[in-house]
Amino acid sequence: MSTSVPSALRIEGLGLQIGGATILKDVELDVAAGSLVGVIGPNGAGKTTLFNVVSGLMKPTSGRVLMNGDDITSASVPARARAGLGRTFQTSSLFPRLSVLENVRLAAQVSLGGDYSLLRFPRRSDAATRLALTKLEAVGLTHKLETAAGDISHGDKRKLEIAVLLVTKASIVLLDEPMAGVGSGDVAGLVENIRDMQRESGCTVLMVEHHIDVLMGLVEKVAVMYFGTIIAYDTPQNIMNDPLVQSAYLGTAAA
């Protein structure tokens, strides 16, 4: 008797229009819990916009977004975060003047029941500090605890963002171009950090990435976006051999 893995994230008929322009059109996606899924497509295909809608930064014109079976289409950004949705952006979302440790400790304090007010943030909370140090050790940043987040490399910033996600215990994680700006020598380590995050927490990961070779070696399935819709969703091997996908990247696929 076979058993199917429940959906962590389900997108049904999602559409977005802005000023009469169609940005997303009939997007359908079913992401199994605990899976690691890549999202690829040409520039302007709608990948980041899709993440913006899923994370609540933009409201769709039509369709639904379900998280673990619950309709979150109208939920606020904080409500989605409380439900377990985490995200990184193409540009850093860290507090640049706070140290590496303070960035993660702040997130840890919130995870332990505090809030994001820096005025009320207990800088020496033992529980938050222990949690932060554990996650910083996991991503290999304990040697930069007192360095300002704005002063570390792009690769280390990505690692720091993963440490923040780990302390928030996000069950669904959206990674928007995590390799952007990362030096070639740091890519392999960051890939391992993403794998470790997924294994350790059991979270579901969706990842937009232009480094196709890196992505294909990391994910279990790939969704291909083209002109605001998903034209293919399959294993990396099948995606690479799909004529429709190949023509989309050559610019000849039907919209």
Regions found by a protein language model. Name each.
Residues 2-255:
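Glycine-rich phosphate-binding loops of nucleotide-dependent enzymes
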